[in-house]
Swiss-Prot record:
<feature type="repeat" description="ANK 2">
    <location>
        <begin position="567"/>
        <end position="596"/>
    </location>
</feature>
<dbReference type="InterPro" id="IPR011333">
    <property type="entry name" value="SKP1/BTB/POZ_sf"/>
</dbReference>
<dbReference type="Pfam" id="PF00651">
    <property type="entry name" value="BTB"/>
</dbReference>
<protein>
    <recommendedName>
        <fullName>Ankyrin repeat and BTB/POZ domain-containing protein 2</fullName>
    </recommendedName>
</protein>
<dbReference type="InterPro" id="IPR000210">
    <property type="entry name" value="BTB/POZ_dom"/>
</dbReference>
<dbReference type="GO" id="GO:0046982">
    <property type="term" value="F:protein heterodimerization activity"/>
</dbReference>
<dbReference type="InterPro" id="IPR036770">
    <property type="entry name" value="Ankyrin_rpt-contain_sf"/>
</dbReference>
<keyword id="KW-0677">Repeat</keyword>
<dbReference type="InterPro" id="IPR052089">
    <property type="entry name" value="Ankyrin-BTB/POZ_domain"/>
</dbReference>
<comment type="function">
    <text>May be involved in the initiation of hepatocyte growth.</text>
</comment>
<feature type="domain" description="BTB">
    <location>
        <begin position="844"/>
        <end position="913"/>
    </location>
</feature>
<dbReference type="Pfam" id="PF12796">
    <property type="entry name" value="Ank_2"/>
</dbReference>
<dbReference type="InterPro" id="IPR009072">
    <property type="entry name" value="Histone-fold"/>
</dbReference>
<dbReference type="InterPro" id="IPR048063">
    <property type="entry name" value="ABTB2_BTB_POZ"/>
</dbReference>
<feature type="repeat" description="ANK 3">
    <location>
        <begin position="606"/>
        <end position="635"/>
    </location>
</feature>
<dbReference type="InterPro" id="IPR002110">
    <property type="entry name" value="Ankyrin_rpt"/>
</dbReference>
<feature type="repeat" description="ANK 4">
    <location>
        <begin position="649"/>
        <end position="678"/>
    </location>
</feature>
Length: 1024
């Protein structure tokens, strides 16, 4: 027993006190951790020694019955397995999700490298859209728990949640997608209100709908827009990853170029066989990792020590070393262990390997990574003991220790194999929790959080904001420095206990900075007291001389655990974040700056103000208090020099309240009087000042109670943008009622929301307001989305007022320019006879019978005129020989046929006089006999005589008789006169009636295409 205890103690000492699992002086370094698998490289002699030397090489592998027994266990076909999963808690079934099946289909149709990819069946799309919900819920639940710490969800919480739920490979892919989307969003800051968030990020899924979904599910009381962008990008990237894997399985060469449609069965087969996808897409609350649907454990290629493509720097490495790497790979798949020493050794060796293969963090430049290399992650003793509690196996424990007899009876049921995650997943999740805390040490709390995620039926509270001292970070300090740090930790603990009578002793223990001492997280005792809402402690610390406006510093070796989003926060910020109004009142009374760190405004020290945080949370009392103390709602719109800035990622207070749907807070902010500051204009605003002043003054007198300053107008327009993006229609309309001018994108989003909610009174109001949008705003979005939306309304609405408003908009968009005229076809007939031979029996060699009357003609002219006449002549000769030369023509009147022949004999239309009543019939005959020039001439004559009464009939003729130019002209005529045409039953029957569909007509689609082309050419292309 003493030997066992000594071995365990030595292993724990190596694990917790060694220099970082992979440092250069480590006693157990794996120099060959980058070598590839030896499954193909090892020769037969090495295979023969598998049973001898291999097991003796590693200290954790010297037992007959160890963690290897759990690696390749074959799952028995037990009928209770299905029942086992049926008893596991399931994820909630939500009614709404931020995407539609159409959105998923569009992502699947996106081309890759210009290659056309196979399509997915409708059932496969429906199935995938449903499976994605589970992945979203998992990520959202983890982000929700991580957001408890600061009562705010940022991109850091979302990215950590993705890393918790997904494998290393998928998480890195999602992180890169998020970085790309955020970069595109930042680079398009100049298009702020002109384009939607998704368009600016290059995403198909709607960022606005994701933000609204995050608010509705209360992931946090504050959602940062970067968090919504990151989550949207990650979910879209997951669809693309699944598509790539499905297409790779369909293609023989793995390139995804296989033909045919991807079925739902093929999709499910790929997911069931993929250990990185199957568990994430299951309906159970606990996360199944590292296993596929068959229960087969697998190690992701990202972590495998054998996927480097080469044997490393020493290709002559002996077989034993390569087998050691293979041993490590298999050991990471262990689901239980027999002793704490075995677990310690496995974790130690795995950390050595991970330290040598630490990837570059997405979004971090190599230069910055070199300046600030990631700290090596260590494991505290309590973390190992907690992990062993979840991984211990009584049977293996008895076999490991010969002095320990197995119990005759057990009081606890063992977890079935299917519910046991491999060691690799325990480590991955625990390390992710530690890295999110910016801690260099995995502690027992990280293991408990991992157990909650990986095992069914377990739960624990999220981590709270409190002082955390990392003792392992003291290892490199000398005795004196370590003593000071231990005393500092003692001081924080004394203050954190809530006893005000210990303040003087605690301050003395904190060190030379006293009450303003900062811990590893960059926080002072006052900040912790404010976050906890301990009013008595806050008062005592203020009396002790605590600095009220000291800020959380940036990350540094002295403060290694600073959360990136908490930089430059003050004590007031923490009190506002956690909603402690009495503490906020106390701090303000004591002289804390109401704007937080904005007192030292600058790009490097920029942070959200307390008023912004209170506005985002919708805390009406806090907002009122801060406003009464002089907080400026427009502070984020200006930098220290008064210049407007679009470089910061933060929004103004109006935008925060509007983005989260807090209408009462927005109204309270609007009651704040406008400060009389001189507006600083950009060059563009200076050039447009004259026009804008007249517009603003007219709007201010008629639509708003007061004239808005230019700065407040911009702030409210930004708030209007966010409310429209996130679907808060009432807020958008209320801001419009104040006189805030429309932007085209805001108007389109508002119209879409009102239409989807069937609020036709708002639809009518929006349509009526379209004329207030400047024509300079018309862009590609109007062509691709706005017109589509308005024609959808036209198809479904039965409200005459709405239809009349739509007609007015279509006419306005078409413009006052004339309809493009139909061009003539300049075509000379191949043969020509003197008009004297028209219907002349002399020298005639063919006779037509039309309406019982004979018409004489000449073959030489007709055969060369069109293929239709040539076919008639040929067929008649073959059927009747030369005995009969009469060809009967039906469905054409005699005088129409005579005008047709007149065109042929005259050689053109110059000498022809066509009565208006006969134009359409002649057009039909010209189309029948394939006389293009005559048909085009008839089209031109029709366009010249087109009227509101004849337009519908002419359009039908043009469609039936294949006259596209005339049909296009009619569509332009419809758009120019739609308001009058809607009064006619014939036109309504054309666009709404079933007869149009029976005839193969889709006039609304044709009108939309014509108007889109017109708007694009007049308003979009002409500006380029």
């Amino acid at each position: 027993m003493a030997g066992t205890y000594s071995s365990t103690l030595k292993t724990l000492e190596d694990l917790t006190l060694d220099s970082g699992y992979g440092a250069g002086d480590s006693c157990r370094s794996l120099s060959l951790s980058s070598s590839k698998s030896n499954s193909q490289a090892l020769n037969s002699s090495a295979q023969q020694h598998r049973g001898a030397a291999w097991w003796c090489y590693s200290g954790s592998m010297n037992s007959r019955h160890n963690s290897w027994d759990t690696v390749n266990t074959v799952l028995p076909e037990d009928p209770e397995v299905a029942d086992l999963f049926s008893r596991c808690p399931r994820l909630p079934e939500l009614e709404e999700f931020p995407w539609t099946e159409g959105d998923v289909a569009r992502v699947l149709r996106k081309s890759v490298g210009g290659r056309r990819l196979p399509s997915f069946s409708a059932e496969a799309v429906r199935r995938l859209a449903g499976l994605l919900r589970r992945a979203l819920i998992r990520v959202a639940r983890e982000a929700q728990r991580l957001s408890v710490l600061h009562a705010k969800c940022t991109r850091f919480e979302v990215q950590s949640a993705v890393r918790l739920v997904h494998s290393w490979a998928l998480a890195e892919s999602c992180a890169l997608a998020a970085v790309k989307a955020l970069s595109l969003y930042s680079m398009s800051a100049g298009d702020g209100l002109r384009r939607g968030k998704s368009a600016r990020c290059g995403l198909t899924f709607s960022v606005g709908r994701f933000f609204r979904w995050m608010v509705d599910t209360r992931i946090s009381v504050r959602i940062h827009e970067y968090a919504a962008i990151s989550l949207t990008a990650c979910m879209e990237n997951l669809v693309e990853e699944i598509r790539a894997r499905v297409l790779a399985s369909q293609s023989p060469d793995g390139g995804g170029a296989g033909g045919g449609e991807v079925s739902a069965e093929a999709l499910e087969m790929v997911i069931n066989n993929d250990a990185e996808l199957w568990g994430v897409l299951q309906p159970y609350e606990h996360l199944i990792c590292g296993k596929n649907a068959n229960g087969v454990l697998s190690l992701p290629a990202y972590f495998s020590p054998y996927n480097g493509g080469s044997l490393g720097h020493d290709e002559r490495a002996d077989a034993y070393a390569q087998l050691e790497l293979r041993t490590l790979e298999q050991s990471l798949l262990a689901t239980c262990v027999g002793s704490i020493s075995e677990l310690s050794d496995l974790v130690s060796r795995a950390m050595h390997h991970m330290q040598g293969r630490h990837p570059l963090c997405p979004g971090t430049s190599p230069a910055r990574q070199a300046r600030q290399p990631p700290q090596p992650i260590t494991w505290s003793p309590d973390a190992l003991h907690t992990l062993y509690y979840f991984l211990r196996c009584p049977q293996m424990e008895s076999m490991e220790n010969p002095n320990l007899d197995p119990p005759r009876m057990t009081l606890n049921n063992e977890r079935p194999f299917m519910l046991l995650p491999p060691l690799m997943e325990w480590m991955r999740v625990a390390i992710t929790y530690a890295e999110h805390r910016r801690s260099p040490t995995v502690d027992s709390g990280d293991i408990r959080q991992a157990a909650r995620l990986l095992l069914p039926g377990l739960d624990c509270e999220p981590r709270q904001l409190k002082p955390e001292c990392c003792f392992s970070s003291f290892r490199r300090l000398d005795a004196r420095a370590a003593t000071e740090r231990f005393n500092q930790d003692l001081g924080f603990r004394m203050l954190n206990c809530g006893r005000t009578d210990l303040i003087s002793q605690a301050i003395e223990a904190l060190g030379p900075d006293g009450v303003n001492t900062m811990d590893d997280q960059g926080m002072t005792p006052l900040m912790y007291a404010c976050a906890a809402g301990d009013e008595a402690m806050v008062q005592m610390l203020i009396d002790a001389g605590a600095n009220l406006d000291i800020q959380v510093p940036s990350h540094s070796p002295r403060h290694p655990s600073v959360h990136p989003d908490s930089r430059h926060w003050t004590s007031l910020t923490f009190a506002v974040l956690h909603g402690h109004i009495s503490v906020v009142q106390l701090l303000l009374d004591a002289g804390a700056h109401v704007e937080g760190s904005a007192v030292n405004s600058g790009e490097d020290s920029y942070a959200e103000t307390p008023l912004q945080l209170a506005s985002a949370a919708g805390n009406y009392e806090l907002v009122s208090l801060l406003l009464s103390r002089g907080a400026d709602p427009l502070l984020s719109m200006l930098e220290a020099n008064g210049m407007a800035s679009s470089l910061h990622e933060e929004m103004n207070c109006f935008s925060h309240s509007a983005a989260h749907g807090h209408r009462n807070v927005l109204r309270k902010l609007l009651t704040q009087p406008q400060q009389a500051k001189a507006d600083v204009l950009s060059l563009e605003e200076i050039l447009a000042e004259g026009v804008e002043e007249s517009d603003t003054s007219s709007q201010g007198s008629s639509e708003g109670p007061v004239r808005l300053s230019r700065t407040r107008t911009k702030a409210l327009q930004e708030a209007m943008y966010y409310s429209a993006e996130h679907g808060y229609l009432d807020i958008t309309m209320e801001l419009r009622a104040l006189g805030v001018p429309w932007k085209l994108h805001i108007w389109i989003e508002s119209l879409r929301t009102s239409f989807s909610q069937s609020r036709y009174s708002v639809v009518q109001s929006l349509l009526k307001d379209f004329s207030s949008i400047k024509e300079e705003e018309y862009n590609e979005e109007l062509v691709t989305e706005g017109l589509q939306l308005m024609f959808d309304i036209l198809k479904t609405s039965k409200n005459d007022s709405v239809l009349q408003q739509l007609a007015t908009i279509f006419t306005h968009c078409y413009g006052t320019s004339p309809i493009p005229s139909i061009p003539e076809i300049r075509k000379t007939l191949p043969a020509r006879l003197d008009p004297h031979f028209l219907n002349n029996k002399e020298m005639s060699d063919v006779t037509f019978l039309v309406e019982g009357k004979l018409f004489y003609a000449h073959k030489v002219l007709l055969v060369t005129a069109s293929n239709r006449f040539k076919t008639l002549m040929t067929n008649k000769s073959e059927q009747d020989g030369d005995s009969s030369k009469t060809i009967e023509i039906s469905d054409i009147k005699y005088h129409i046929f005579q005008m047709l022949m007149q065109y042929l004999y005259y050689g053109g239309t110059e000498s022809m006089e066509i009565p208006t009543a006969d134009i359409l019939q002649l057009l039909s005959a010209a189309n029948l006999f394939q006389l293009d020039a005559l048909q085009r001439h008839c089209e031109i004559l029709c366009s010249q005589t087109l009227s509101v009464e004849s337009a519908v009939n002419t359009y039908k003729y043009a469609k039936i008789h294949n006259a596209p130019e005339l049909a296009l002209f009619c569509e332009g005529f419809f758009l120019k006169h739609m308001k009058a045409l809607l009064e006619q039953d014939a036109f309504r029957q054309l666009i709404y009636g079933r007869s149009s569909k029976v005839q193969g007509l889709d006039p609304l689609q044709d009108l939309q295409s014509t108007l889109a082309e017109r708007v694009h050419s007049v308003y979009v292309t002409s500006r380029v």
